[in-house]
């Protein structure tokens, strides 16, 4: 290998190492800060806003209103757990059984990829990372998930998740969603409304709360049944999530 190539390789290696250190400090600081402070915006919100500007859409505003857990209907927390991660109170960030099932499904159905991200993983991804699929991003997501599971309580993870989740075009967080779609604060959401909001979470830019498709309605009904089977509101109290 020539001296010039060695120099370039050495420069790139030093740059990447320094970048990793900077990102580790940034993300570690974010995990520590947001364990107590409200989250003003997420990486997904920034990505959506910048993308809108780059496409000439200057009317787009990524909107979110932070609310604490006692300002959110307990039905909402229960709905997203029923829909997205029923083992949320028990695991340490990863649902191994669901991951194995998703891998088996994806091997059989290459055109219909199924995910197995927990609420903790989705929180880490939405808060700190860019959109897309790659092994690098998955590795970073795993590390960040372990970080927030170590530092944050389950209640804090759920609170942050509900405040940064995307519920529609420019609608981030359950308070903004409740105001936009039901003209009420998040604290007043009914069981049915909470289930409808949770029903669009797989793809909130495709599935609409304001114009729910047959699929969304059937998913809403399924979520309502799961909420009942989990035990209703006492489930949240039992796991200290309310």
From Swiss-Prot:
Its EC number is 2.4.99.28. It comes from Escherichia coli O1:K1 / APEC. It is an enzyme of class 2 (transferase). Keywords: Cell inner membrane, Cell membrane, Cell shape, Cell wall biogenesis/degradation, Glycosyltransferase, Membrane, Peptidoglycan synthesis, Transferase, Transmembrane, Transmembrane helix. GO terms for molecular function: pentosyltransferase activity; peptidoglycan glycosyltransferase activity. It is a single-pass membrane protein. One of its GO terms (cellular component) is plasma membrane. SUPFAM superfamilies: Lysozyme-like. One of its GO terms (biological process) is cell wall organization. Belongs to the glycosyltransferase 51 family. This is Biosynthetic peptidoglycan transglycosylase. Peptidoglycan polymerase that catalyzes glycan chain elongation from lipid-linked precursors. It catalyses: [GlcNAc-(1->4)-Mur2Ac(oyl-L-Ala-gamma-D-Glu-L-Lys-D-Ala-D-Ala)](n)-di-trans,octa-cis-undecaprenyl diphosphate + beta-D-GlcNAc-(1->4)-Mur2Ac(oyl-L-Ala-gamma-D-Glu-L-Lys-D-Ala-D-Ala)-di-trans,octa-cis-undecaprenyl diphosphate = [GlcNAc-(1->4)-Mur2Ac(oyl-L-Ala-gamma-D-Glu-L-Lys-D-Ala-D-Ala)](n+1)-di-trans,octa-cis-undecaprenyl diphosphate + di-trans,octa-cis-undecaprenyl diphosphate + H(+). Its main location: membrane. It is found in: Cell inner membrane. Signal peptide: none annotated. Pathway: Cell wall biogenesis; peptidoglycan biosynthesis. The chain crosses the membrane at residues 19-39. HAMAP family: PGT_MtgA.
